[in-house]
Amino acid sequence: MSQRFDVIPLFDSYQPFYALGRGELFPGDIPAVKAFVESLEDVVSESINDYRHVKDFLWSKCRRSEATYNAFRSESERFLLWAWCVHGKSIAALKKRDIEAYIDFVVSPPKSWIGTQVCRRFTVKNGLKEPNKEWRPFVAKISKAERKESLKRASRKEVQPDTGNYALSQKSLQEVFSNLSVLYNHLVEEDYAFGNVVSAVKKASPHLIVDVSNDSVKRLSALQWEYILESTKEKADEDPVWERHLFIIASMKSLYLRVSELSFRPKWTPKMGDFYREDEDWWFTAFGKGNKKRKVSVPVDFLEYLRRYRQSRGLDGLPAVGESSPLLHPIRKHNPGLQARTIAMIAQEAFDLASDRMSKDGFRDDAKILLATSTHWLRHTGASMDVESRALKDLSADLGHGKLSTTDKEYVHADDKERAASGRTRRV
């Protein structure tokens, strides 16, 4: 296979894509996309029709959520590029063996298709958008722990990802199958494809590992959480800038929030007025996955962190009814709040602070785990710690789970506890 990379991204980001309108096929401000797709007609006669149907799929299936759009765009885009530029076929003509070949490709793509960092798809030049030459359909990554450890070494040079070490996780492979299946269901509904063979390919795939274990979600230990909370609180006592750090980690752990539920998005900007009182109880309105609002109970102990964060911003007491102040004050004044990536970076600073203190106190293994911790661990930590003291239906409602069984599966591991207890005293 050629090591040249001569393909381009096909679809713009969420807002420009939907601003284009369903009736417009190609974006007028990105002439390179139209030229690229049309240039392939000599090899794949249905390239324009392929593009049209995938664009319509993204338009109809992903409008409600930018995250959903991004996930399906990435998979649909590289699937089209592979079908046209590597396999030389229309996606409407692909059979079972072709999909198997695509899965092999995704698991082990050529180095020329792999980047070492996430890049913008397009750059602006003279009022028009051009394909970013640094963009690649696949990205090799290194763990946060490896990156942090590299900076601690004497060279102080941050280790860079190696395209030769690209590896697709089992979770990502599952998502490839899922996204492809949804795409083909749409193509079949539109009479553009004759059938959906993705599930059959998945069932026989040698790349998928069947996991029969009931793996628990990633969470922090009580000791790790204590270090994060106390070290961040002490830092905030010294420097008011850290009050935002403290409020973020306390909110995500105590209210079981996802990072997106604290961030501003096109359809939602979290405000202080999302906290409200009913009788003697406080609640928080979260706007979560699937564009669904949910009502989250607020523990009394959390109100201390809400008060001190508000005080650091010059706001009185607890939120007033309908208060429009942004929930998280922005770094840039023109923004209505903080974006998810910025919130994650702030939380990581708290994790790093706690990691340093744990390491100095001799808890080096625990400290290393904190280097790899993500914000989502806080949500899982809060739920895991509370599951034994709260009614499962109440915890499930606060988490925003549609089914009680989801909460039970993720956070109740009675069988594992009994199994671990019975095996703890085995002799070597």
Which role does the model predict for each range below?
Residues Q170, E226-V259:
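Basic, Lys/Arg- and aromatic-enriched nucleic-acid-binding interface segment
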Residues F264-R308, G314:
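Conserved tyrosine-mediated DNA breakage-rejoining catalytic core shared by Y-recombinases
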Residues H53-N70, E77-N214, E234-K235:
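N-terminal core-binding DNA-recognition domain of tyrosine recombinases/integrases
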Residues A397, K409-V428:
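DNA/chromatin major-groove-contacting recognition/catalytic segments
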Residues V300-I369:
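Active-site/catalytic core of tyrosine-dependent DNA strand-transfer enzymes
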Residues T269-F275, S389-E410:
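Short, polar N-cap/turn motifs at the start of nucleic acid-interacting alpha helices
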Residues A344-A397, L404:
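Short, basic (Lys/Arg/His-rich) helix/loop patches that form interaction surfaces
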Residues S181-N185, E243-S263, W283-F284, M385:
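Short pre-functional
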